[in-house]
UniProtKB/Swiss-Prot annotation:
Sequence similarity: Belongs to the ClpX chaperone family. HslU subfamily.
Function according to Swiss-Prot or TrEMBL: ATPase subunit of a proteasome-like degradation complex; this subunit has chaperone activity. The binding of ATP and its subsequent hydrolysis by HslU are essential for unfolding of protein substrates subsequently hydrolyzed by HslV. HslU recognizes the N-terminal part of its protein substrates and unfolds these before they are guided to HslV for hydrolysis.
Name this protein carries in UniProt: ATP-dependent protease ATPase subunit HslU
Database matches in CDD domains: RecA-like_HslU
Lineage per the UniProt record: Bacteria, Pseudomonadati, Pseudomonadota, Alphaproteobacteria, Rhodospirillales
SUBUNIT field: A double ring-shaped homohexamer of HslV is capped on each side by a ring-shaped HslU homohexamer. The assembly of the HslU/HslV complex is dependent on binding of ATP.
Entry binding sites for ATP: 18, 60-65, 248, 313, 385
BP terms from Gene Ontology: protein unfolding; proteolysis involved in protein catabolic process
Originating organism: Rhodospirillum rubrum (strain ATCC 11170 / ATH 1.1.1 / DSM 467 / LMG 4362 / NCIMB 8255 / S1)
Family annotation (SMART domains): AAA, ClpB_D2-small
InterPro entries given in the database record: AAA+_ATPase, ATP-dep_Clp_protease_ClpX, ATPase_AAA_core, Clp_ATPase_C, HslU, P-loop_NTPase
Keyword terms of this UniProt record: ATP-binding, Chaperone, Cytoplasm, Nucleotide-binding, Stress response
Domain of life: Bacteria
Gene Ontology CC terms, in alphabetical order: HslUV protease complex
HAMAP family in UniProt: HslU
Length: 435
């Protein structure tokens, strides 16, 4: 995993997310502590457990976005899941142990990609030989092969069609559900795993251009050079030591104290999460995986429920609490302008593909931010997601007619904002009284 300092992690998150300094600092420290733990002696390393985080804040303020950006930054097995997906063991639905199984699958993909890069040079050479075999046959003289090799490397025969033998995946075979086996890979029996050898080594002839065959053959040759046992071992080690799970919508499985009733399944999910977060061993088809050092970051809006409505034991296992603040008009203005891929940058780029140049003066950006804040205040506060609604309504006409206006420069004015989005704000007050 990357050895970024907390300051570097925060500055990287700042490129994409406005504000929320406390949340950024908390995840930066947690991520750095993963690296610090790796530097300790083995005896002490086992004792240092991750300090799990609970992020609390209204919807649309950046909780999920922090998770998405952290995933790209961490270069460690990372999984983002919604707590609402899961049900208590014994109920229909996924049980929480599938989180770790999915995390292992993610780690395997990462590990294979990393190891493929290491053997890439040899795989490229082997793939080149296979292309030459398809072009001139394996009995051609060395001079002929050398001549074609030169043409191949110079790209002169990229468009030539060849027939190569590639592995036949044959499409995924259907899976069967075995009731009453929650520990056995989600109760799923995969026929590919049983008959893998019989089906996996079949090849089929495929016709493709020399250029297209390159990526297919390099990947195949790289996979032949990988030691699958080593890949699995490294992936499980990565999950156990560096795995990060982001549990979104945790508030949806908390039952408000005055509404406790038939929601057994929701509280059951919390109970099932306890051992997972505290540290347990989960059975996967690749072997047992310990979760003692997996970092859990939970987040929720807590509109109807409060953090105190979570089971006390679960609260205790999420010791670091971070509150994310609601966004105001000033924040909205910064969101529209500052991030690298801000909404305004995205819309400008999209319409530039049609030859239309969009311009947003400062007062227009202010008007968009103000009207988004106004609607959030009068209907339902959905945070920065309201900007999507406002901009879509504002640019709807321009987007529709863009193909006929190629070469034009369109200045989006404050008056256009009032004219096209003002009605949305005017209706907002009444909408809450309409059934």
């Amino acid at each position: 995993m990357n050895a970024f300092t907390p300051r570097e992690i925060v500055s990287e998150l700042d490129r994409h997310i406005v504000g929320q300094k406390d949340a950024k600092r908390a995840v930066a420290i947690a991520l750095r502590n993963r690296w610090r733990r790796q530097q300790l002696s083995e005896a002490l390393r086992d004792e240092v457990l991750p300090k799990n985080i609970l992020m609390i804040g209204p919807t649309g303020v950046g909780k999920t976005e922090i998770a998405r950006r952290l995933a790209k930054l961490a270069q460690a097995p990372f999984l983002k899941v919604e707590a609402t997906k899961f049900t208590e063991v014994g109920y229909v639905g996924r049980d929480v142990e599938s989180i770790i199984r999915d995390l292992v699958e993610t780690a395997l993909t990462q590990e294979r990609d990393r190891l493929r890069k290491q053997v890439n040079a040899k795989a490229e050479a082997n793939a080149e030989e296979r292309v030459l075999d398809a072009l001139v046959g394996d009995r051609a003289s060395p001079e002929t092969r050398q001549k074609f090799r030169k043409m191949l490397r110079e790209g002169q025969i990229n468009d030539k069609e060849i027939e190569v033998q590639v592995q036949d995946s044959g499409g995924a075979l259907p899976t069967m559900d075995i009731p009453g086996m929650p520990g056995a890979q989600m109760g799923m029996l995969n026929l590919n795993d049983i008959f893998g050898k019989a089906f996996g080594n079949r090849t089929k002839a495929r016709k493709m251009t020399v250029e297209d065959s390159h990526a297919v053959l390099v990947r195949e040759e790289a996979d032949k050079l990988l030691d699958e046992e080593q890949v699995v071992k490294a992936a499980i080690a990565a999950v156990e030591n560096n795995g990060i799970v982001f549990l979104d919508e945790i508030d949806k499985i908390a039952t408000a104290s005055e509404r406790r009733g038939g929601d057994v399944s929701r509280e059951g999910v919390q109970r099932d999460l306890l051992p997972l977060i505290e540290g347990t061993t989960v059975s996967t088809k690749y072997g047992p995986v310990k979760t003692d050092h997996v970092l859990f970051i939970a987040s929720g809006a807590f509109h109807t429920a409060k953090p105190a409505d979570l089971l006390p034991e679960l609260q205790g296992r999420l010791p670091i609490r971070v509150e994310l603040s609601a966004l105001n008009a000033g924040d909205f203005k910064r969101i529209l302008l500052e991030p690298e891929a801000s909404l305004i940058t995205q819309y400008k780029a999209l319409l530039a593909t049609e030859g239309v140049t969009l311009e947003f003066p400062d007062d227009t950006v202010e008007a968009i931010a103000e009207i988004a804040t106004e609607i959030n205040g009068s209907v339902e506060n959905i945070g920065a997601r309201r900007l999507h609604t406002v901009l879509e309504r504002l640019l709807e006409e321009i987007s529709f007619t863009a193909t006929d206006r190629s070469g034009e420069t369109i200045v989006v004015t404050r008056d256009m904002v009032k004219e096209r989005v003002g009605a949305l704000a005017a209706k907002a007050d009444l909408s809450r009284f309409i059934l």
